[in-house]
Amino acid sequence: MTNMQEMLGSMGEGEEGIATNVDIVFVIDATRSMQTTIDMVKESALSFQDKLYDFMDEAKRSINNLRIKVVWFRDFYYDGNYAYDESKFFELPEEKEEFRDFVNGIHEAGGGDDPESGLEALSMAMRSDFVQEGEKKRHIIVLHTSCCVDNKNDINISCNSFLTFAH
């Protein structure tokens, strides 16, 4: 099973051709620790739509409505008011240029201590205004961070994680 299959769930009996509403939130670590990988992470976010549509075509499934949102974070304690930002949900492909502009505006800075604020940003992503309409819905959160451990609370997080909420 591919990562895309895991994110979108398996197709049940008789589900071929069912349109799916998909919301994706990218949570991106924008601290200095991402200096060597931030461009790759941004490119991954920007190319995700095309890869998703290719996969859906192969699976004989369609996306009725695709929305993508971005939450970037640094360190709430260290960076204060410059610790995060979040976009609205961009309707794709209609708002692809606005999505690209938001993602390209992310730059690495700040941080300065561990842990960074990945759990807070993940919490913000989980409180997003996810789509509620449609026969099939998929709510996906993609977390990109270089800080894998919250030493204070002894919590381990995979550096690149897919969290799927399906309805």
Question: PLM features: residue spans?
Answer:
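Divalent cation-coordinating acidic motifs and surrounding scaffolds
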Residues: 1-167
